[in-house]
């Protein structure tokens, strides 16, 4: 099985138990861009068609922001920003958590 097929299989197995909450830890890790897009669509469809709360944890904001309603940015185990994807893209605290203080943030 490919990496994407394995991820889909794991999600399918998890859904067999009809969970109320689905926790996906780094679901996009080690996947190619096409497979990431496919998995994002699966996650969005699950959100729209089921009564499951989905929690995604990932280090790559670009992968998460395409398939979530709201997100939190953590730094040193503390929430530094939360909101919709469009709000977080423009949030200086979120940018600083990802890029550090090395870059000037306008």
Regions from the PLM with identified roles:
Residues 11:
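Hydrophobic anchor residue at the start of the ABC signature
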Residues 18:
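Conserved catalytic motifs of ABC-family nucleotide-binding domains
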Residues 26-27:
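Walker B catalytic motif
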Residues 33-35:
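Helix N-cap at the start of a conserved alpha-helix in ABC-type nucleotide-binding domains
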Residues 37-49:
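Helical segment within the ABC ATPase nucleotide-binding domain
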Residues 58-59:
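H-loop/switch region of ABC-family ATPase nucleotide-binding domains
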């Amino acid at each position: 099985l490919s990496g994407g097929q394995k991820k889909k299989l794991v999600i399918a197995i998890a859904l067999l138990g009809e969970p109320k909450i689905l926790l996906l830890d780094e679901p996009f890790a080690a996947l190619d861009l096409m497979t990431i897009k496919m998995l994002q669509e699966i996650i969005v469809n699950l959100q729209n068609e089921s009564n499951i709360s989905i929690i995604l944890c990932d280090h790559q904001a670009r992968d998460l922001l395409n398939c979530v309603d709201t997100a939190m940015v953590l730094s040193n185990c503390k929430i530094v920003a939360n909101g919709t994807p469009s709000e977080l893209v423009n949030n200086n605290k979120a940018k600083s958590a990802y890029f550090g203080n090395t870059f000037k943030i306008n």
